[in-house]
Amino acid sequence: MIISSTTDFREAARRQLPRFLFDYIDGGAYAERTLARNVSDLADISLRQRVLKDVSRVSTRTTLFGVEQTLPVALAPVGLTGMYARRGEVQAARAAAAKGVPFCLSTVSVCDLAEVSRASSAPIWFQLYMLRDRGFMRDLLARAADAGATALVFTVDMPVPGARYRDAHSGMTGPNAAMRRLVQAVFKPGWAWDVGVMGRPHTLGNVAPVLGENTGLEDFMGWLGANFDPSIQWKDLDWIRDQWKGPLILKGVLDPEDAKAAADIGADGIVVSNHGGRQLDGVLSSARALPDIAEAVGDRLTVLADGGVRSGLDVVRMLALGAKGVLLGRAFVYALAARGGPGVSQLLDLIEKEMRVAMALTGVNTLDQIDRSILAKTDR
């Protein structure tokens, strides 16, 4: 099929994947209202089209956390990415490095830190949850440092997992889940061979040293779910700071007061995020939450955002609302599932092209010229 947008990548991924995997990446919590609003609220932001401006020197380059990159984007941490394409984290990391943007590896990745680091020609970021087992966390942070990870993305919006009803219907969870997944895989022979057979081992690579290489994926996920720590408080971040000396980015901030608290404890950055609509349904979309948060913290830390970004135009919208950079989650997984690493490369090229067009038509040449002044008055 012809692919010219993230919507096309999504459709190609739907055709390629068993339902349980497609719905896992595509779905959200409860009735998925916040998931939908992430996309619609951002798409509804109107820009000012300007004319007769010299836009012959458009550049999408920026610097995040002291590292220059070609685009103000990073590939977000997405669990089980290695189930969407053969050794999916490796393929995505290579594509990100080739484009000059960061790849963030999830704690619950199929490929472990060492494998991804060896395969990538550029340093990676690493994402971490607060777990009850502090010894495991300490070991994981040490392994991240040894693997050359340059930034830690610490997820703060998951003291407990969200209620994701679609997973029970699709076979990711629920009655007879394993049998339902097997039947679905039979009808997706391309995926079954490429990932199901050639993509082994299907383990959570970063957790395997604790539970063993032969532990099943469901047991890995069960152990992880039981280890989320709902008692975490702001004071616990002092412990993280003691273990990690590089940039610390808190992911999952949706309230200005929490953003200011992040700045107070010395975080280097935050990600304005509702976990892609996968945690608490009914909260603000990222696009609606972002302006107040950016205003509340000013330049005290670097504000990133995710949620609903499906194009380079959406990236420009997020920058105009106050973000310095954007994380791409579902979009890159759709591309990975559809066409592997080359699909991720194609997506990033598309994002850059769309950004350049949007910048030229709003009359700006550089990212520091993108602010609320390029928004239509109704959206400022």
From Swiss-Prot:
Q: Which cofactor does it need?
A: FMN
- State what this protein does: Catalyzes the conversion of L-lactate to pyruvate. Is coupled to the respiratory chain.
Q: Which NCBIfam families match?
A: L_lactate_LldD, PRK11197.1
| Record's catalysed reaction(s) | (S)-lactate + A = pyruvate + AH2
Q: What is this protein called?
A: L-lactate dehydrogenase
Please name the source species. Answer: Caulobacter sp. (strain K31)
Which key words are in the record?
Answer: Cell inner membrane, Cell membrane, Flavoprotein, FMN, Membrane, Oxidoreductase
Keyword Membrane part of the UniProt annotation: yes
**Residue numbers binding FMN:** 106, 127, 155, 251, 306-330
Q: Where does substrate bind?
A: 24, 129, 164, 278
The entry's family comment says: Belongs to the FMN-dependent alpha-hydroxy acid dehydrogenase family.
Under Enzyme Commission nomenclature, its number is 1.1.-.-
Source organism, top-level taxon: Bacteria
Question: Which PROSITE patterns does this chain map to?
Answer: FMN_HYDROXY_ACID_DH_1, FMN_HYDROXY_ACID_DH_2
Q: Which Gene Ontology molecular-function terms are recorded? A: FMN binding; L-lactate dehydrogenase activity
Q: Which Gene Ontology biological process is one annotated for this entry?
A: lactate metabolic process
Residue ranges constituting the FMN hydroxy acid dehydrogenase domain according to the UniProt record = 1-380
Kindly give the Pfam families that the UniProt entry links to this protein.
FMN_dh
SUPFAM superfamilies for this protein: FMN-linked oxidoreductases
